Regions:
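Central antiparallel beta-sheet cores of small beta-barrel/beta-sandwich binding domains
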Residues: 2-78, 85-86, 93
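N-terminal cap/lid segment of alpha/beta-hydrolase-fold proteins
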Residues: 108-151, 524, 528-530
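Cap/lid segment of the alpha/beta-hydrolase catalytic domain
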Residues: 117, 149-216, 391-396, 515-517, ...
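Glycine/threonine-rich phosphate-binding loop and adjacent beta-strand/alpha-helix elements that clamp
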Residues: 133, 404, 417-665
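Accessory cap/linker subdomain of secreted extracellular hydrolases
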Residues: 177, 239-343
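Alpha/beta-hydrolase fold nucleophile elbow
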Residues: 219-231
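Glycine-rich nucleophile elbow surrounding the catalytic serine of serine-hydrolase chemistry
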Residues: 229-239
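Short beta-strand/loop motif that positions the catalytic acidic residue
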Residues: 344, 350-352
């Protein structure tokens, strides 16, 4: 009965957060063979294995699945669905699981040759030095791992500066076997490197400069250095690039974090408390175990300043520093890359995913594209989340998964080894288009043929939940009705995320929340009769009033499928106190209608015929964003809150709407 393909849903066993335990589609499963010798695996949607099944005990009404590790699944049949719990070492792991049979199989996960040109082959034997110290200009010693090709060279150098304490043997062998010297360097305060981790911006910039120039002088190096790095490592690559070291020949970061007031730890100066997981992970010289942290329950309590202590992480200086700067002040401006990006002289390849929870690559592309005379820049935006476009399950089609290192290798073959492989003459933008599930090359970002289309919010005053009368249309509203709801910080509208994951997942199903939460207004279009492609930056403009001194306005864009399930496309937030600018705070006047402009990030998606476009408006998405306590005080340090009574206006004088970048088809 298990043979075939399954969707896998998870839910946490218990939580103090209302709605936080909602079922989430987290992965897929495939089984083959008779029950007596069945094989298969359960994988996350990113493609990572959760359980490789090696043993099955099948009874008439239940199944036990186990593998080589410590995980076991006990499940009972409910019709054609399996429902049960996960066990770790025979004990409940606090997570429930459902397997729902798919009607169509997943596509086999083979990397797609997005850039089909030739790349350097794996041909060299490899030697490793697991601990080499580099001395910075101020005398600090930074621990480095070096993998070298066996040969005389000269070789290009691939440098990865990292705050993560791991020896990158796999990466080292990949690059060195292909004719590159690979260097992974621990930043200050990590592993056995001197100093304090996450120090000031200037130190990271200087260390990046020094590391590039040191790497360029390594034996058998050709003097050309390229930098890679994922997530925070990508930030470090950008920090080095803005210092313009003479021997930095190219960078190719993936999912690089952006300016910190824009994303991580704040999003447009709204704090994201789920980053406590990362702060606890990084609180010491080595990566800390956070697998047992009950972050969901801890988040239910106030104030946020005490969150690391409630989790048993102790004092976390990085967390304290984040909390200490709640406005766009000189601290955050100093850490920004976009304002210094004209200093970057090296060619840039950026790789990320539409569901990455970092907007850095798009922000950097926009800023760098405005610099006259900058060397070549390429942007690759795929279907993945923060872990990368390498880890995408097959549900987006045969072209969905791309090998990041192969793109970086072709980039460095050109700029570090001088091979005329044509990568600098190709169209500079690659986007994966959801719906069509194809990659497409473009001449520029944003797309020149974009037509901004306004979709207006309207109702008869009862838009609460998806059963209400909220309408989304390209025709401006003619009526004068407004919609109201109450926002209670004790029961915030939830965002579907397991906070033990360090990222948002791919396309969350918000169907149940749209139907049940009366503190969210829902506006849905008519059935689409033709495809509508939306590729680019999205935004919203709301006219709204509150009786609170401060509050939040959140807009989410969703794709409603013919079967009724609603998948999140993107969302964005405006904190009322920052409506005049992120560097100043202005409390509200009770009942005054104000305009809020909200950044909805970006996507590339075809809303297909038979689908509907949906917009929801709420005042919380917790714990993605911290709860606004509605008092006008400090939302991170305070514990008292009030209920806010909200009014969204959508009349001819106040035409609340979203703007979608439509691509003619």
């Amino acid at each position: 009965m298990l043979v075939g393909d399954w969707d896998v849903y998870f839910a946490r066993g218990s939580t103090a957060l209302p709605g936080f335990e909602g079922w989430r589609r987290m992965g897929f499963a495939h089984f083959a063979g008779p029950d007596s010798s069945l094989t298969g695996s359960i994988r996350r949607r990113t493609g990572e294995p959760i359980l490789v099944v090696t043993h099955v005990v099948a009874r008439r009404d239940s199944v036990r699945l186990s593998g080589d590790g410590n995980l076991t699944i006990d499940a009972a049949w409910r019709g054609d669905t399996l429902a049960g719990t996960m066990l770790a070492d025979g004990k409940p792991a606090g997570q429930r699981i459902r397997l729902v049979r798919r009607t169509t199989p997943f596509v086999a996960e083979q990397p797609y040759a997005l850039w089909p040109g030739a790349v350097s082959d794996s041909q060299y034997a490899v030697t490793e030095d697991t601990l080499v110290f580099m001395r910075t200009r101020d005398g600090a010693r930074l621990a480095s791992y070096i993998a070298r090709p066996v040969g005389n060279g000269p070789f290009g150098v691939v440098l990865q500066r990292t705050p993560y304490t791991r020896i990158l043997h796999t990466a080292g062998h990949y690059w060195a076997s292909r004719g590159y010297i690979f260097v992974a360097q621990h930043v200050r305060g990590r592993d056995v490197s001197d100093g304090t981790v996450f120090g000031d911006y200037d130190t990271d910039v200087r260390d990046g400069y020094d590391a590039v120039e040191w790497a360029a002088r390594l034996p058998n190096a050709n003097g050309r250095v390229g930098m890679i790095g994922h997530s925070d490592e990508g930030r470090l690559a950008w920090y080095a690039a803005v210092s313009a070291p003479p021997h930095l020949a190219a960078i190719a970061p993936s999912a690089a974090t952006g300016d910190p007031w824009r994303i991580v730890p704040y999003e447009d100066m709204v704090f994201s408390p789920i980053n406590v997981a990362w702060a606890c992970l990084m609180r010491a010289r080595t990566l800390q175990d956070i697998s047992e942290l009950d972050i969901g329950a801890a988040l239910a309590h106030l104030p946020l300043t005490d969150l690391p202590q409630r989790l048993g992480c102790g004092d976390v200086p990085l967390w304290n520093r984040w909390i200490a700067h709640p406005t766009l002040d000189t601290y955050w401006r100093a850490h920004a890359v976009t304002t210094k990006i004209a200093r970057v002289k090296a060619p840039v390849l950026q790789i990320s995913g539409w569901y990455d929870d970092s907007r850095g690559p798009i922000d950097y592309t926009n800023a760098l594209s405005a610099v006259r005379g900058h060397p070549f820049i390429r942007l690759v935006m795929g279907p993945g989340a923060h872990k990368g476009i390498d880890y995408v399950a097959g549900e987006f089609g045969a072209q969905s998964r791309v090998e990041t290192r192969r793109l970086q290798l072709r980039w460095f073959d050109r700029y570090l080894m001088g091979k005329d492989n044509g990568v600098d003459r190709e169209l500079p933008v690659d986007v994966f288009v959801f719906g069509d599930n194809i990659w497409r090359k473009e001449a520029a970002w944003p797309l020149a043929r974009t037509t901004p289309v306004k979709w207006y919010l309207a109702s008869g005053g009862r838009a609460n939940t998806s059963a209400g009368d909220g309408v989304l249309d390209t025709i401006a509203p003619s009526g004068s009705a407004a919609d109201t709801f109450s926002y209670d910080p004790a029961n915030p509208t939830p965002f579907l995320i397991d906070s033990r994951e360090l990222e948002t997942s791919l396309n969350e199903d918000f169907t149940a929340l749209n139907a049940s939460r009366h503190d969210a207004l829902v506006f849905t279009s008519k059935l689409l009769t033709k495809p509508i492609e939306v590729t680019g930056q999205m935004s919203a403009a709301l006219w709204a009033a509150s009786d609170a001194r401060d509050t939040d306005w959140i807009v989410m864009l969703l794709d409603v499928f013919p079967d009724g399930h609603a998948e999140r496309v993107q969302d964005g937030i405006a904190r009322a106190r920052f409506r005049l600018g992120f560097d100043r705070e202005a409390v509200l006047v009770s009942g005054n209608v104000e305009r809020y402009d909200i950044d909805l990030w970006f996507t590339s998606r075809v809303f297909e015929p038979g689908h509907r476009i949906r917009v929801s408006v709420s005042s919380a998405l917790f714990p993605k964003y911290d709860r606004n306590l509605n008092t006008g005080g400090n939302n991170e340090r305070d514990s008292t809150f009030v209920v806010a009574h909200q009014r969204l206006v959508h009349d001819p004088a106040h035409p609340s709407h979203v703007v979608l970048p439509v691509i003619p088809r």
